[in-house]
Amino acid sequence: MAAKGARMIIHLECTECKNRNYTTEKNKKNDPDRLELRKYCKFCRKHTLHRETK
């Protein structure tokens, strides 16, 4: 059987309202630190910083 890949599904949480708005994949070997992206939050109705959660 083939080995399982290094890519994991992560959730992105808005830093202002704490809602988990996005899911994405990342490679844990290439990017061991937490991901931070500025994305649109539909609850805040503006672009905010979203951080990776478990």
UniProtKB/Swiss-Prot annotation:
Disulphide linkage map: none
Gene3D superfamilies with a match to the protein in the record: Ribosomal protein L33
Keyword Ribonucleoprotein applies: yes
SUPFAM superfamilies the record matches: Zn-binding ribosomal proteins
Keywords from the UniProt entry: Ribonucleoprotein, Ribosomal protein
Keyword Ribosomal protein assigned: yes
Gene Ontology BP terms: translation
Pfam families (alphabetical): Ribosomal_L33
GO cellular component term of the entry, any: ribonucleoprotein complex
Molecular functions (GO terms): structural constituent of ribosome
InterPro entries: Ribosomal_bL33, Ribosomal_bL33_CS, Ribosomal_bL33_sf, Ribosomal_zn-bd
Similarity comment text for this entry: Belongs to the bacterial ribosomal protein bL33 family.
Protein name: Large ribosomal subunit protein bL33
Gene that encodes the chain: rpmG
